[in-house]
Each structure stands twice: as C-alpha cells, then as structure tokens.
Amino acid sequence: MLGAVFLLLFWPWTVIGQEKKEAQSLTVFAAASLTVPLQKITTAYTETGAGRVDLSFAASSTLARQIAAGAPCDIFISADRAWMDHLIEEGLITPENRRNLLGNALVMVAPLDSRGESASEDIQPTLNLSPRFGLEGEIMAILGSGRIAMGDPAYVPAGIYGREALMSLGVWMNLRHRLIPTANDRLATVLVERGEAPLGIVYASDSHTSHALRLVAAFPQSSHTPIVYPLGLISDSAAVRDFRDFLFSEKASAIFTGSGFQTIEFLSGNR
C-alpha cells in the first residue's frame, strides 16, 4: 500500500520532469561553413546541463526553403543576409528576433603542396588578387586543365560572393566556364583537399580549419558584399533564447574566432 502511495505521489513529478527536459531540446539550421565551430559550441553548451541541441547543416538557400516549407526549426543561421530577409518577408522570423552573429572573408586555396604549407598557417599568399592586366592568365596557369571548385553561384552564398569577387576583378566572363559548382561551401573545400580541383574559392574559416590546403590569395574585402552571418529565431522559448545568448558568449566567440570567423557583435545596427 505504501509503495502504491509512493508511486502516486512521485510518478507525476517524474513525468513532468521528463517533459520539461524534452521541451528544452531544440533544432538549429545553420550554413554548412559553420559545421566545425557549432559542433564544438553545442558540446560546450550541453556540458553545462542544458537540453539537447540538434544541428542540421546545408547551404543557406536549402535550409531557408526547408523552413519556408514547414521543416521544424528553432534557430536559423544563414551565411548571407538575403535568405534571412526572405524568411522575414515570409513572416517566419520577426525583425526583432534577427541579429548579426559573425563575419567571414573569401580566399582562393589550392591542395597542400610539397612545401607542406597549409592555409591555416601564417604564410604569404602566392597570388595578388587585384584588378590588373595578366591576372586571368596567372589563374589559368595554376588551373591547367582543371577547374575551380566553389559554391554554386546561382544560389549558394559562398558562390554568390565568389562571383561578385571575380566580376570585380574582371575575370568572371572567362572563368565562369571553368567552375565546379557545389551544393555548399564545405563540398568545394573537400574537392580541393582531395586534389580533385586545383583551385577553390571558399570562406577563410574553411581554409583556417583545414590541414590539407594552402592559401593562394585573399580576395579584397571591397571585391564582394560584406560576408555577414545573421541569426534568426523561428520559435521564441526560454531554451531557444538561452542557446542564442550562449552563441554570443565569450566562450562561443573564442571558438568562432579560433575557427577563422570574425565576431561582429560590436557593429552598429547589430541587435
């Protein structure tokens, strides 16, 4: 009898506790270029005793379309502002729940060569990317019969930035036929790492965390639209806000900068 009373007294509280724990789990859709740091940050976050965080990585365009189609998601981190703007226009994210999280840069990379130089080391670029006579020929000489791996410029943010940069340098028209367009930036990085492409145009963060690449050149910041990663809340619960705040913490910022990103919380207009 006492055992039955004990169960009646404590069983409901156990269920409530389980429901509370389940309610703390959340889903984050993030640009593929954020894979390495977000996995580390999520591990650090869950070690604090917080709920589970499920991560889904893909091209920002793919994720935005999935969200618009009704895919369950609590936080969206895009690699460009256009797709975040799209979800705001669709009424899925409110302007007050949008905040700029990170910045990035664009670089040209090649497979690690016999000198053992990697893009993550502090080495001098081997190519001067400035609008000048002969630049196209120098790039073609490195390419040989190969192609440039980069995100698809039709919809992948990294590819869109890459197209802007090549157009700014005056070499897009001829190089556009020498591309391997990929579904996201990480795939372009992998193709170069494997030696399947002699050159790649990727984010500086991807080259920073790779030990199989060497830096060929850094694109001038003025050659493309500023690379900004906005964060938006799809749902607005205490657990979602808690993880959002953790992403802006000093611990998370250290992981982001250690992965080659630029933190931009101090920029004006970042809410």
Give the role of each language-model region.
Residues 13-61, 65-71, 78-81, 85-271:
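Exported/periplasmic ABC-transporter solute-binding proteins
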